[in-house]
Amino acid sequence: MATNGCLISLPPFFTTTKSISSYPFLSTQLKPISLSSSLPTLLSLNKRTTQFPTFVSVLSEDDNTLVLDDQEQGGDFPSFVGEAGETEEYQEPSEDAKLFVGNLPYDIDSEGLAQLFQQAGVVEIAEVIYNRETDRSRGFGFVTMSTVEEADKAVELYSQYDLNGRLLTVNKAAPRGSRPERAPRTFQPTYRIYVGNIPWDIDDARLEQVFSEHGKVVSARVVFDRESGRSRGFGFVTMSSEAEMSEAIANLDGQTLDGRTIRVNAAEERPRRNTY
């Protein structure tokens, strides 16, 4: 018994080459693009899969044909590389773009420091240094700008900048493993006060608060033991003028602070050691 049937010739679903005109989104002026031969593609022509290709392995410019790789996709998507296998990597800022920022107000955190220096350029890193024992700011930090030029601009803008009543010290941080060259010393009068017999729980911020009632405080520092991290019971305060220093000494020497009688007098400069 004969059976009825018809012969239909179906075109192959995929071909190894196709005219570039069928892909209007590709320009005939494109340069050849070569992916690494070790990287798999998304399509295997041998298996007649219905998955559409995502990556083009070779774009031929001579005959305007689009050639698909015949390897099967496996694993993660490949990463693109340029000519000669070059990859774009992040470059760390120069050490010359790192700044030391001293005499910071104690309520300024790293975020506030970064926001301040954004006026000079792009801030890569901003860090306020804290005491490990008390978790309080030590009054200084570091800022790394994006370029050396921006770092120079930041020094110009913020050196001796008045931030909440304190004059900032801003200069280039010394590169790791090297000692900064010391500038020639010039004599500048400092109105520094020694404060003794202070209570053990007094920190820099409280000491500054006490002396700020008698003038502008440039800096205030309680001396802590390096090993234990506890106060050694004395500190130093620098006022902005001789008159304010004299007023603070006259009003605070012999006064009681949290149950202890404090000693307040002009600090003596340490004698310089002779070098041979």
UniProtKB/Swiss-Prot annotation:
Alphabetical keyword list: Chloroplast, mRNA processing, Plastid, Repeat, Ribonucleoprotein, RNA-binding, Transit peptide
Ranges for domain RRM: 97-175, 191-269
Superkingdom in the source lineage: Eukaryota
A GO cellular component annotation in the UniProt record: chloroplast thylakoid membrane
Pfam family, one: RRM_1
The UniProt record lists the keyword Cell division: no
Compartments, as annotated in UniProt: Plastid, Chloroplast
Span of chain positions assigned to the transit peptide in the UniProt entry: 1-57
Transit peptide found in the keyword field: yes
GO molecular function annotations of the record: mRNA binding
CDD domains in UniProt: RRM2_NsCP33_like
Cystine pairs: none
One GO term of the biological process aspect: mRNA processing
Purpose: Probably involved in the 3'-end processing of chloroplast mRNA's.
Protein name (Swiss-Prot/TrEMBL): 28 kDa ribonucleoprotein, chloroplastic
Species, as recorded: Nicotiana sylvestris
